[in-house]
Amino acid sequence: MEMKNMQLFADNPTVNVTTDSGLSAENKTFYDRALIEEAQPNLIHGQFGQKRPIPRNGGKRIQFRRYASLPKALKPLTEGVTPEGRKLSATALEAEVNQYGDFVCLSDVLDLTAIDNNVLEATKAVGRQAGMTLDTITRNVLQSGTNVYYCPKVAANGQTTPVTDRQGLDKTCVLTVDVVKKVAAMLKAANAPRIAGDYVCILHPYVAYDIMSDPHWEDMHKYCSPENMYEGEIGRIAGVRFVETSEAAVYKGEGDECPAGLAVFGCLFLAEGAYGVTEVTGGGLQTIVKQLGSAGTADPLDQRSTVGWKALQTAEILMEPYMVRVECCSAFSPTAEAN
């Protein structure tokens, strides 16, 4: 099996064309479902965003809406008099939708009358790749937010020193319960709405290791039923639910302006309505299966079949005050690599 390089397709992203000549509708549905099932667990960063369907015949741009808060209604009502009321103010934010995709080549014969194990395994492999690719695209947008908090330095006597930039971090600048409480307070002060009663933090397993040993840590089974758990959720502390992924941002080296020899982790604290993403279902992510012989003269001996994926994706920050990027080090910072 040979993996091809990632490519950005230049075709019109609104055209929903999948060439699967000869595949039955039943098999096509099966492979589409298998692809999405493999991709879904890797879509950690997109699960808390405002979802928008991909545009149909609407060009390469998608629109998200940001609603302004209403002012307090402090004027007492007069009996029998209807107040003037207010208009709901919405700001439209547009983002460009791009198309991504990749494929693998198979030399085995594709049996179009039954579900083929090789094709299924290839579908699972490209599904995992699709999920990680789309998740990284969303992650990179969210990591570009301007609302940043740097974990303070902690001396041996417990005294803390504020840090004002990434290069100022050192190995003592780890995520603590006190930091979590401060960031939660920042979101509360911004009147940022909670997600199902709590704020959410997406963090790397190396950072999770540092904070899970705190005595106030709650394992997820103690406060949440399995059907209400987020993808990747590991626990809660101080009103913040933590979601773990190895794809959480890790920075390292001079190019990322990191302290010498130490990796820096970007932890995303999120409230409801902080950002928007395109939906994966409904045509946002497609399977493309090409049978042997479908390439014509490009494959004169009918030696190749392919399994691939194609997706439309974008993400957009909608409310900067509703998200905070906390940058910190970890016990694993000396050995962790950038991603």
PLM regions and their residue ranges:
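Hydrophobic alpha-helical segments involved in membrane association or supramolecular assembly
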Residues: 64, 124, 128, 201, ...
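Alpha-helical scaffold segments that mediate packing/assembly in large oligomeric complexes
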Residues: 110-189, 337-338
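N-terminal "assembly arms/tails" that initiate or stabilize quaternary assembly
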Residues: 2-96, 323, 337
